Amino acid sequence: MTEDLHLDRDALVAAIMTFLANQDHLDEIRASIEAEIDSAGQEALADLNRRLVATGADWTYYERDPLARRLHQRLADRILLSGSTLVGVDHLAAIVGKPVVIVANHLSYSDANLVEVLLSRAGAAGRSVSDRLTVIAGPKVYSSLKRLFSSLCFGTIKTPQSSAVSSENAVMNAREVARAARQSIDAAHERLFRGDALLVFAEGTRSRSREMQQTLTAVTRYFDFPDVWVLPAGIIGTEEMFPIGEDGLHPVRAIATIGPPIEARALHDDAGGDRRRMMDIVGAKIAELLPADYRGAYS
């Protein structure tokens, strides 16, 4: 982001309210946001501004911002309708204290925020994952103030999108893309070493039909870490929260379902070391967590 960016209290509130132009009770929402910012204080606002300027400049890890996280959780109180929940919380007990890569389908720019909020609401086991969540994010996440602000609710690692799903890397030659991808993977392994839980969207891009697309083979590179576990997750509902082609948020009932964790070593053995086969197994595990009309390539 530009080094000239600076949002004071009123400018930050105004920017957040643009997400919500089609909501009811705007005065109540504004008051809730203002109270959260005032409670955090000027130093927290200054920290947020510093992170907005610095985040996304290179292919590396960026830390979360506590104020951005709290503000999004207040917004979630208004956006997520009754029935929005995390299913399969019991599976989280198996990954406590272990390196884990959560692999999910992808419907919306709001998917990672949904996962973070639902985990934070899911008792001690959920909070333990939410508090160490780091999301693998493509360049578009850092391309606008709105998306960048949303990305500060958790750690992120900027990564180039696969050439199979993106034209964004056209200005980079193949060697540059490979170097950037290597930096991102190294950063991810460092975060796993430090105890983070990685969240990766297996298809590499949002589905425009809500049906699953074939997963990307390159995702297996995140599994190349000692004793790592793979946790499949299925998301529904967010395609209506932040529809493709629209800027505003819509209230929705959204659900994330967690499946049984898979030891990456066992996944590798089951696939005979074939990385494409590994990701098709993971894709099928995600599809099992989704309604039939979301399964697409893994029906």
Predicted segments — roles?
Residues 1-101, 106-124, 128-130, 141, ...:
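Membrane-anchoring hydrophobic helices of lipid-metabolizing enzymes
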Residues 82-85, 177-182, 212-213:
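A conditional alpha-helix N-cap/helix-loop micro-motif detector
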Residues 107, 111, 180, 211-217:
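Short, glycine/acidic-rich beta->alpha junctions
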Residues 134-139:
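Short internal beta-strands
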Residues 143-146, 176-189:
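A contiguous catalytic/ligand-binding core that recognizes phosphate-bearing ligands
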Residues 148-151, 196-197, 202-272:
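A cross-family acyltransferase "interaction/gating" segment
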Residues 165-180, 208-209:
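Surface-exposed cleft-lining segments at the edges of enzyme active sites
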